[in-house]
Amino acid sequence: MIDREQIVRIVSDYLSTGETFLVEVAIHPGNRILVELDSAQGVCIDECVALSRHIESQVDRDLEDYELEVGSTGLTSPLKVMRQWENCIDSELSVLLTNGMKETGRLITVAPEAIKLEVVRMVKPEGAKRKKPETQELTIVMADIKQAVRII
């Protein structure tokens, strides 16, 4: 069985000097290795090919055969690591909470323990007949977030 930690080390060492960063390494049955990358500017195919070749040069296919797939996370893929959150500041997000509620708004700040979203709520001012849009800041604890994706 291919060691996930070995792949993480190889990828992390390779990416340590650039803007591209590791999001996830998954090893599926049949030694199918999936490596997901991301970057503020996006990940080009040349970076994926170069990293794939680097991994193949470090992991001996003769000892144990494997299938390797290196790619970028999609624009609408869920956010998984802190650097992805940081790259999404000032972007619109859809955040699904663990209680089933969904919040949509512009990401203002992010910290390891919580995020702050700017959301628009329809509020009825006192004495008014209709609701009017009102911008509010909403703090959401990371532990309460089930999934968050960018809105394009």
From Swiss-Prot:
UniProt xrefs under Gene3D superfamilies: RimP-like superfamily, N-terminal (3.30.300.70)
Localization of this protein: Cytoplasm
What is the disulfide pattern of this chain?
Answer: none
Q: What is its main location?
A: cytoplasm
Keyword annotations of the record: Cytoplasm, Ribosome biogenesis
Family designation: Belongs to the RimP family.
What is the name listed in the Swiss-Prot or TrEMBL entry for this protein?
Ribosome maturation factor RimP
Organism the protein comes from: Porphyromonas gingivalis (strain ATCC 33277 / DSM 20709 / CIP 103683 / JCM 12257 / NCTC 11834 / 2561)
Q: What does the organism's lineage look like at the top?
A: Bacteria, Pseudomonadati, Bacteroidota, Bacteroidia, Bacteroidales
